[in-house]
């Protein structure tokens, strides 16, 4: 995982979009925004994922392959949906099994922070955080999606500032 401030240029979202000079963002800074990160130790991620699930009460999981082959005719529409700025009522938890991609989150100053993820990364985006996702130029990512309850992924596009989970999120990060 690598995190840095996004350059905000209006070019292909699958490009790195790293400012020049680069402005790195540390794991501690991500944590201040409520984002959690684990680096899974080896190719056999299952035991580590099971422990994280037990510790954090994640009850359900599934897998998604985000690629032209995996999504077929839905690929372009799904990528557009994933890249629209949104939030969720629940945490978004992803263990990256194969491939690479980018999660962009809004930091405390409402700047975009780009988080490059690859196989072996597990990331938790808190409920209420504005974010988006895209593949990189390899156009392939396979991830395990983890859920506290039923496997549901419902994006709520910005603006959602009046939603209770957005307000709860802002209260938590203000305290950090």
Where is each model-derived feature located?
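Conserved metal-binding segment of the jelly-roll/cupin
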Residues: 117-137
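Short Gly/Pro-enriched loop/turn and capping motifs at secondary-structure junctions
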Residues: 101-102, 110, 122, 130-132, ...
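Short, conserved beta-strand element in jelly-roll/cupin
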Residues: 87-107, 124
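N-terminal leader/capping segments at the start of a protein or of a new domain
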Residues: 1-61
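Conserved short histidine dyad/triad with adjacent acidic residue
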Residues: 63-89
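A short beta-loop-beta micro-motif enriched in histidine and acidic residues
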Residues: 79-93, 110-112, 117-119
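Double-stranded beta-helix
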Residues: 134-176
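Surface loops and adjacent helix of pleckstrin homology
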Residues: 106-108, 128, 136, 146
């Amino acid at each position: 995982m690598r995190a840095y401030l996004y350059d905000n240029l209006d070019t292909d979202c699958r490009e790195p979009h790293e400012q020049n000079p680069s402005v790195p963002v540390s794991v501690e800074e991500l944590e201040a925004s409520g984002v959690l990160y684990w680096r899974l130790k080896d190719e056999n991620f299952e035991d580590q994922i099971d422990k994280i699930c037990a510790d954090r009460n994640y009850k359900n999981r599934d897998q998604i392959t985000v690629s032209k082959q995996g999504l077929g005719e839905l690929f372009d529409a799904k990528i557009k949906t994933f890249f629209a700025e949104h939030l969720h009522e629940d945490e978004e938890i992803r263990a990256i099994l194969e491939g690479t991609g980018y999660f962009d989150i809004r930091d405390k100053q409402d700047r975009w922070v780009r988080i490059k993820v690859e196989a072996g990364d597990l990331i938790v985006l808190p409920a209420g955080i504005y974010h988006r996702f895209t593949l990189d130029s390899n156009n392939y990512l396979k991830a395990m999606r983890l859920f506290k309850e039923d496997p549901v992924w419902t994006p709520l596009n910005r603006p959602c500032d009046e939603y209770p989970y957005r307000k709860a999120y802002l209260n938590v990060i203000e305290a950090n």
